UniProtKB/Swiss-Prot annotation:
Name of the gene this protein is made from: Nup50
Cross-link type Glycyl lysine isopeptide (Lys-Gly) (interchain with G-Cter in SUMO2), residue numbers: 351
Function, in words: Component of the nuclear pore complex that has a direct role in nuclear protein import. Actively displaces NLSs from importin-alpha, and facilitates disassembly of the importin-alpha:beta-cargo complex and importin recycling. Interacts with regulatory proteins of cell cycle progression including CDKN1B. This interaction is required for correct intracellular transport and degradation of CDKN1B.
Protein name in the entry: Nuclear pore complex protein Nup50
Source species: Mus musculus
Keyword Hydrolase set for record: no
Length: 466
């Protein structure tokens, strides 16, 4: 809507006059008949529902949706699975939650919002839907050696520890840099998960805990897990590269804790600790391995400039020691400081060797009853072979463009005007108008002082009469 225009003009004659008082109008409510004929627009949402309903790149991503089931899994990219039922630890036949004995997974706080960081649902349906121990129907024995560890229970501990470690790592780095790319994390997560599944298939349910492990579980362990047996070290590094001696090992490690009620141990994974080859060894003898992350060279979330060999690591948290780009330049010794002053333009004046008179001037030409500037240059008076005088004005440039080049004719008007001006009428060369090159024009020559103007006027009169 355009602004209101002033109703009367304010001048020096009516500035002291009072303005007429305007009455303020009031709004009136329109009747129902008028409102029926009016089109009332209402705001509507363009995208109704969640983004995954309408498709897109994250169509299958259900991580931000609260699981509808009472318990179970909701993985990194799938929907909620079925709750685990029928899991026992060998001493009781009651149904238990999948990770009741893991403290780190008791109250899961998701890195993506409100979903539990656990394994994918396909793993639940295939592998651990309802595993049971071989001796679940036998009465429990009082001896510590009679109770056997279920392979599914050990698998659950590894899976829970892996999930919790990935969750903590993601929370830490997402809080630091929310724009980081998490795609490679899930690819490596699948590799570790496949390794755990392979161990579950190869290990079977025949592994048992010895009395030595039972005795060391309650006291302060000499190693990280409290296991007195040396396991063969077989760390898994990302992209299949072996751990380098020069690089620091950032490993998933597990701390063993005693569980009096279940008679089993719970494992929690952590980053940044160097462990021995007996990592995860107390859960099952010889079938479990440690998960190591090489802090080698190229990394998604940082890079180690001191590492020379290219062992890739996607979870390397070591900050880069060298800048990523070369945007900033360092001052070196011996460099010349830049001068803020602009470079001076050096003009080489074109000299006329045979000129007997030269003077700086500014040339104007008359057009439409006003003088317009032609340029600044040097006026030269030169003798010719026909005993006439040539008036030449060259511009003060390196090229020395010719502004005016005429002969002083006997009938050429030449007058002294103004303070320091000399007025002549001639046919300009080069012409001012290419369509009418022979049309005479009035040229005004302005010099620095009045004495210079008098001298120039005197010389022009002498040469004109000669």
């Amino acid at each position: 809507m355009a602004k209101r225009v002033a109703e009367k003009e304010l001048t020096d004659r009516n500035w002291d006059e009072e303005d007429e008082v305007e009455e303020m109008g009031t709004f009136s409510v329109a009747s129902e008949e008028v409102m029926k004929n009016r089109a009332v627009k209402k705001a509507k949402r363009r995208n109704v529902g969640f983004e995954s309903d309408s498709g897109g790149a994250f169509k299958g991503f259900k991580g931000l949706v609260v699981p509808s089931g009472g318990g179970g899994f909701s993985g990194f990219g799938g929907s909620g699975g079925k709750p685990l039922e029928g899991l026992t630890n060998g001493n009781s036949t009651d149904n238990a939650t999948p990770f009741s004995n893991v403290k780190t997974a008791a109250e899961p706080k998701a890195a993506f919002g409100s979903f539990a960081v656990n394994g994918p649902t396909t793993l639940v349906d295939k592998k651990i839907s309802s595993p049971k121990c071989n001796n679940s129907n036998q009465p429990p024995s009082s001896g510590p050696a009679s109770s056997t560890a279920c392979p599914g229970n050990a698998y659950h501990k590894q899976l829970a520890g892996l999930n919790c470690s990935v969750r903590d790592w993601i929370v830490k780095h997402v809080n630091t840099n929310p724009l980081c790319d998490l795609t490679p994390i899930f690819k490596d997560y699948e590799r570790y998960l496949a390794t755990i599944e392979k161990q579950l298939e190869n290990g079977g349910g025949s592994s048992s805990e010895s009395q030595t492990d039972r005795a060391t579980a309650g006291m302060e362990p000499p190693s990280l897990f409290g296991s007195t047996k040396l396991q063969q070290e077989s760390p898994f590094s990302f992209h299949g590269n072996k751990a380098e001696d020069t690089s620091e090992k950032v490993e998933f490690t597990a701390e063993k804790k005693s569980d009096a009620a279940q008679g089993a141990t719970s494992a929690s994974f952590s980053f940044g600790k160097k462990i021995e080859s007996s990592a995860l060894g107390s859960l099952s003898s010889g079938s479990l391995t440690g998960f190591s992350f090489s802090a080698g060279s190229s990394s998604l979330f940082g890079k180690d400039a001191a590492q020379s060999k290219a062992a890739s690591s996607l979870f390397s948290a070591k900050a880069s020691e060298s800048p990523a780009g070369g945007g900033s330049s360092e001052c070196r010794d011996g460099e010349e400081e830049e001068n803020d002053e602009p470079p001076k333009v050096v003009v080489t004046e074109v000299k006329e060797e045979d000129a007997f008179y030269s003077k700086k001037c500014k040339l104007f030409y008359k057009k439409d009853n006003e003088f317009k500037e032609k340029g600044v240059g040097t006026l030269h008076l030169k003798p010719t072979a026909t005993q006439k005088t040539q008036l030449l004005v060259r511009a003060d440039t390196n090229l020395g463009n010719i502004l005016l080049n005429v002969l002083i004719a006997p009938n050429m008007p030449c007058t002294r005007t103004g303070k320091n001006n000399v007025l002549i009428v001639c046919v300009p060369n080069p012409p001012l108008d290419e369509k009418q090159p022979t049309l005479p024009a009035t040229m005004l020559i302005r010099v620095k002082t009045s004495e210079d103007a008098d001298e120039l006027h005197k010389i022009l009169l002498e040469k004109k009469d000669a």
